[in-house]
């Protein structure tokens, strides 16, 4: 089946964020998986309604409980999976490469990110992985991109500048395994322009992640 523009933007934007694709056939077929903590249940159901045509008739979002070793607490989460779909391989080929050393698929920013980073895709990307930097102190925002390669993160930076004239900086972050990652910082000077690009496509329950221009949130 062909995808609508909203479905394409949701998939692309959320693959830059929390979304992922899974394969059990050595990359021949793929399914999309969305997973969010219980506080974001409404947002997960928003994703489900858009991608429902890709899901099985009996597929519904499901709640699960996992133990978080970092906090020694149980965490409630909601998730859903689509069925495998030929349209998803297009995105998998952009985002994923197979690492022979680890025997795992690795996700990174597509080389052609600029081609697909529409305002709506950017909104989903930010909703998934963005946050205010200092609520009540600054209008600056940030996007947690440290899981990507430095080159991939720079590709996002260049796309934001070329497409929307939004200047950003990179902040170094040390990951749990000791590797260095890079988080995209959206300074105050760029926050207004960034907000105007994504504002028409924000999901109501996630608007609080975006600066209102007065050091608060929408």
Swiss-Prot record:
Family of this protein? Belongs to the LAGLIDADG endonuclease family.
Sorted keywords for this record are: Chloroplast, Endonuclease, Hydrolase, Intron homing, Nuclease, Plastid
Its recorded name reads DNA endonuclease I-ChuI
Its Enzyme Commission number?
3.1.-.-
Keyword Chloroplast in record: yes
Q: What class of enzyme is it?
A: hydrolase
- Give one GO molecular function term: endonuclease activity
Quote a single Gene Ontology cellular component term.
chloroplast
- Function field: Probable endonuclease involved in intron homing. Encoded in the group-I intron of the subunit rRNA-encoding gene (rrnL), it generates a staggered cut with 4-nt (CTCG) 3'-OH overhangs 2 bp downstream from the intron insertion site.
Give the location in the cell: Plastid, Chloroplast
Identify the SUPFAM superfamilies for this entry: Homing endonucleases (SSF55608)
Q: Which GO terms describe its biological process?
A: intron homing
Q: Which InterPro entries match?
A: Homing_endonucl, LAGLIDADG_dom
């Amino acid at each position: 089946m062909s995808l609508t523009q909203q479905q394409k933007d949701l998939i692309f934007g959320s693959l830059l964020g929390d979304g992922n694709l899974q394969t059990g056939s050595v990359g021949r077929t793929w399914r999309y998986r969305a997973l969010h903590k219980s506080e974001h249940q409404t947002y997960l159901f928003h994703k489900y309604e858009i991608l429902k045509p890709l899901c099985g008739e009996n597929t519904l979002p499901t709640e699960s409980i996992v133990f978080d070793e970092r906090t020694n607490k149980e965490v409630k989460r909601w998730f859903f999976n689509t069925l495998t779909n030929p349209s998803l391989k297009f995105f998998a080929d952009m985002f994923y490469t197979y690492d022979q050393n680890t025997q795992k698929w690795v996700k990174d920013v597509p080389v052609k990110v600029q081609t697909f980073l529409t305002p709506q895709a950017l909104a989903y990307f930010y909703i998934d992985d963005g946050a205010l930097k200092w609520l009540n102190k600054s209008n600056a925002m940030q996007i947690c991109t440290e899981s990507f390669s430095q080159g991939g993160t720079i590709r996002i930076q260049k796309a934001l500048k070329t497409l929307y004239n939004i200047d950003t900086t990179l902040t170094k972050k040390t990951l749990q395994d000791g590797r260095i990652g890079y988080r995209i910082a959206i300074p105050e000077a760029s926050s207004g322009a960034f907000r105007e690009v994504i504002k028409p496509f924000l999901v109501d329950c996630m608007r609080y992640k975006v600066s209102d221009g007065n050091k608060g949130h929408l």
